[in-house]
Amino acid sequence: MSKDFLLEIGLEEMPAQYVTSSVLQLEKRVTDWLTENKIEFGEIKTYSTPRRLTVLVEGMAEEQANRVEEAKGPAKKIALDDEGNWSKAALGFAKSQKVDPADLTFRDIKGVEYIYIKKEVIGEKTSTLLPNLEKVVTSMTFPVSMHWGSNDLRYIRPIKWLIAMFGEEIIPFEITGVTTSNTSRGHRFLGKSATIKQPSDYPNALLEQFVVVNAEERKQAIVEQLRELESMENWQIKEDDDLLEEVTNLVEYPTVLSGNFEKEYLELPEEVLITTMKEHQRYFPVFSQAGELLPHFVTVRNGNHENLDTVARGNEKVLRARLSDADFFYQEDLKMTIDEAVAKLQNIVFHEKLGTLTEKMKRVQKVALMLADYLDWQEEDKQDIIRLTNIYKFDLVTNIVGEFPELQGLMGEKYALLQGEKPAIATAIREHYLPNSAEGELPQTDLGSLIAIADKLETLIGFFCVNIVPTGSADPFGLRRSAFGAMRIIQANGWDIPMLEVISRIVDMERAEGSAELPGADVKKEVQTFLKNRLRVILQGHHIRHDIIDAVIGGDPNVIPQLIDRAQILNEHAEAEWFRPTIEALSRVVKIAKKYEDGVEVDPALFENEYEQALFDKLEKLKFDYAGLTIIERLKAFADLRTTIDAYFDNTLVMSDNDELKNNRLALLFELASFIKEFAQMDEINVK
């Protein structure tokens, strides 16, 4: 037999961004608890609003199933005394397992006998176990939490009521003075208390009190009302998943309404208007069918259709004040020149150990010019770099960015264009912040890409130099994001930038300017390791085998696009017939070459057979051709060497008793191994 079970945690209004993750956490914790307690159950449904987290478990067994359990005790040699009677250890084990010593048996495990017991455990009634769910509720963790009253519990918001019902039975427990019952609370203003007769009544009982407890149903109701308004007004209301998710978790009974603002505010940059509406007010912007922003907005009310005009006027008043402030900030910004803004940057500290923004921009300029040299950029391009790096952070001191930090870069682009900067420089000011997420948009221009890489690498290495590095999940300065973004941009552009050399030069620059606390060699090594770990993430995103990732990162990690190409090509050909014998042959060369002693050069006059000469000739051709070969051509060249390598080993004793011959042969293998290891550490690849 089974019954449904309902658990509702009633709270003061939670932050919208944590509602979904919190109810999913509750679902997992309840699921784990049921599994651990061997209680069978059917489907688990979740419900959530800003004021409640709920799970409804269908078909929960009324009692645990009877089961047979086994337990292993002490070894036989200590379970019996000298006279063959049970020892204290054996008797203690029997007592702990609640069995008669007569039921103890022995079982052989890998040649050693141990006490074993097999006992039948009678399942407990579920209703006697469910009060322990109190610990499940109190053990939940949240990104933000608080405590209230005189209790010690920290929770996302104060608990105001609790429901725990197994069928019609109330499961008793208490948390912070709140006792479980079968009574929930309806909408804060429109509803009343709702008595739940049985768990399956829960959604409808709350709906009668103006609460839509199913988050997906609330979301769908909002979408349908938005589409209806679009059709009625001939508008476009662009769906924004993040905004839709947030407003869904801000309301319990959604009603969509629209409002207006003065047309003159349309003279503000569109991004300022949209950000004001979306980020500050949680409004949906409205567009014409041609995609032009209109002087209207759409919002979602937590309530019904009564007095919508009054609600709309209230929202219009709030938005009007916001837009008036934005217009004032914008007009004030237009009075300030870029050079005046740049001068203020020397008063803004980037980090106490890394100086001001002005000092950071100067360091980034050096890095950007260094990268331009590696990429053979022209003098005109370098002049653009100099101008760009002299100003590219200027918008951080503008009023609009002070009010709307998410518009940094974007407002810099707009202000730069208004003041006559080159479009390429203006665009790069915006693009240097990209990508702003793991899968975010990348810069589309060369100049924007270069400054983004320079800024991110300087930030990363600067913090490493002063011993501020990510630890565990803590990364307050976004250094993982900086590294990941820089490498994504380098890969996308296919730029053969020698990363190890660049890292070394940036570390030396930071140390020369006094912003370093650690020895240069230590920092260089730490940054290289950090970037290699980010590369692993990129390669995993390309679904590269883990052993191949280890192999290419263990090879030459210097040029990122080439490294990624090598990994992809090895991965693509891993199932080819020739792949395994080729990797085995190359790995053999690498392993034996480790015995090479420095200073010995290959002397063809010491060759004793044609197979040594053949391998030498192939190596000389590889040396001549290698730089001009593509990645796939290099792999094919190694594959072509396989039969020559096999013949060499079949007919040549590398570790000869004659030291001169041995060292000459090791020198030949060492030269070949150098090319192989640059491509990848082939012995890391699993071909078994």
Curated annotation (Swiss-Prot):
Matching InterPro entries: Gly-tRNA-synth_bsu, Gly-tRNA-synth_heterodimer
GO cellular component: cytosol
Gene Ontology process terms (BP): glycyl-tRNA aminoacylation
Summary of subunit composition and partner proteins: Tetramer of two alpha and two beta subunits.
Enzyme Commission code(s) on record: 6.1.1.14
Pfam hit, one: tRNA_synt_2f
Protein name per Swiss-Prot or TrEMBL: Glycine--tRNA ligase beta subunit
Cross-referenced SUPFAM superfamilies: HD-domain/PDEase-like (SSF109604)
Organism this protein belongs to: Listeria monocytogenes serotype 4a (strain HCC23)
GO molecular function: ATP binding; glycine-tRNA ligase activity
Main location (coarse class): cytoplasm
Family note: Belongs to the class-II aminoacyl-tRNA synthetase family.
